[in-house]
């Protein structure tokens, strides 16, 4: 039996992760559709059913380089009984046949070229006398074939008039290929949400600037922007704002055309009040405590920028807290705006390599590295040594969150833990595919 100690207390004044998420998602809806180039549509959601105007293939065509023949002509053909046929034409890919095939005849044909009338099979070059042939007007067939062998039938892929992509489908590389195959260069999708990113703090300097005493590089803007890209949004970056009302309001005003603003820092109870004052002045912003670690402090509400009402999500300034808060709340908001089904990350069971200690009664998202032991074939979770919310390397090294519930003090080494996977390799994919 797992050696877990139940808590005797609970943070009743806090919102659960699920409660906070529900409150946030209630303020979002699916965005409007937009016609975009198919090469820009990867990962987007199709806004309406797509019906093909053509057949794919548009005609019976050859699946091989070879000779179009009539099956009955070669019923007795083999290596010792070569059947010779008269070659009446050559049909390159991109050309239409000009002649009808009769018994005793063949057409030399390339892959993708239309099958001539009268033919019902194709014999590949390697099963003919192609290589040793000196008479281009004749070809020897060395095998018998089945009806329609090596022929791709008209409309076997896509049939004219059929719905080939349903509304709500997520566009993949294969989808883009299908769209191209029916001649479409553009597609109607739910547009990608534009996410404004704004970090705050006098202590920040930008990457590329000279390091200064008392300053730190602004990593949150770049981490959050990368997550927006990863989740299928479009980041709009503002240079970090100083702890001055005028500067913060100026930077926020430049984000008036976004679908969501994400700020980092300034949302904890002990933080400098400039951020809270500006948010309170310009909107209806709630400061929450969420029953999770990292990322307990969270701000969310609607801010008014020049008459436009824009949702604002304020995440903590510590880099790991910012990432986890955006994963737990921002990703879901982006999915809802994109019209995607809002889904949790996959969870697997893994055996702990060392203890996970939960010392303050919040749901703990411990950064862990999951792998499959080559000898035992067991799934192992190794907690990253330094679990501080300021240690960004813990997110770099991890591929999942080991979840310790709020009412548990410790999950011990050797016990099983639920791991929420946020990235994985082929090895972990196999576990996900085979899990109960």
Indicate residue ranges for each PLM-predicted region.
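Short, glycine/charged-enriched hinge/interface segments at domain edges or termini
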Residues: 2-17, 67-237, 385-386, 421, ...
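Flexible glycine/proline-rich
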Residues: 34-39, 48, 94, 158, ...
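Short, conserved secondary-structure segments in the cores of folded domains
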Residues: 46, 58-59, 87, 97, ...
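Solvent-exposed alpha-helices and their adjacent loops that cap or buttress functional pockets
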Residues: 60-62, 77-80, 98-102, 115-117, ...
